[in-house]
Swiss-Prot record:
The lineage of its organism: Bacteria, Pseudomonadati, Pseudomonadota, Gammaproteobacteria, Pasteurellales. It catalyses: a 3-demethylubiquinol + S-adenosyl-L-methionine = a ubiquinol + S-adenosyl-L-homocysteine + H(+); a 3-(all-trans-polyprenyl)benzene-1,2-diol + S-adenosyl-L-methionine = a 2-methoxy-6-(all-trans-polyprenyl)phenol + S-adenosyl-L-homocysteine + H(+). This is Ubiquinone biosynthesis O-methyltransferase. Pathway: Cofactor biosynthesis; ubiquinone biosynthesis. HAMAP family: UbiG. One of its GO terms (molecular function) is 2-polyprenyl-6-hydroxyphenol methylase activity. It comes from Glaesserella parasuis serovar 5 (strain SH0165). S-adenosyl-L-methionine binds at residues 36, 56, 77, 125. One of its GO terms (biological process) is methylation. Belongs to the methyltransferase superfamily. UbiG/COQ3 family. O-methyltransferase that catalyzes the 2 O-methylation steps in the ubiquinone biosynthetic pathway.
Amino acid sequence: MNNIDQQEVEKFEKMAKTWWDPQGDFKPIHLLNPLRLAYINDKTNGLFGKKVLDIGCGGGILSESMAGLGAIVTGIDMAADALLVARQHAESNHLNICYQQITVEDFLKQHCITDTEKFDIITCMEVLEHVPNPHSIIQSCKNLLKEDGLLFISTINRTAKAYMLIIIGAEYVLKMLPKGTHNFEKFIKPSELLRWCSQEDFECKEIVGYHFNPLTKNFWINKDINCNYIAVLQNS
């Protein structure tokens, strides 16, 4: 199955060289990463020794952070240039991360996944709003996760607030993101996400919002999910 938006892939390919520049195109991810890493580590009772699949890993910011805490990480993405950057950066930091240029659907097809080969944790951060068929990714995650394994999905709610803050604010006013990074029509309401997850027998353990203060440059988590949000889902 081809669950790829080539324009989205090309968009991120053009920014590949700036993945590890904390002041570059991916500055928001660098600012957000400590918060989401701590959140994932807390909800999983520690990442050490656990098998993790990072879908849409890009240049490897989250993948490296999880590997640094002792996780056994596989990162997949369709942007070849970003993966080249990810491999080089991991090697320079002496981290053993398996990076592959493949969709999660094809990853599932090409690997004979036994129960022992399945993952304890899957992360899918800021990916669903960039693909044609988000539900397809969730279906694949179902078959790649161990029983009781955890799936972390972060995406953006399709609300007026999200449009103003993410597209107008972050892309045009603050210029934290390149213009055109997001398409409002691809934003996903929590009700839509949870319906897809329910159809695959995932149980939602928690859903929270995360927010950015442009003055302090800090992110924080609360219960407001009208903009960016992250869901923790357990495979049942």
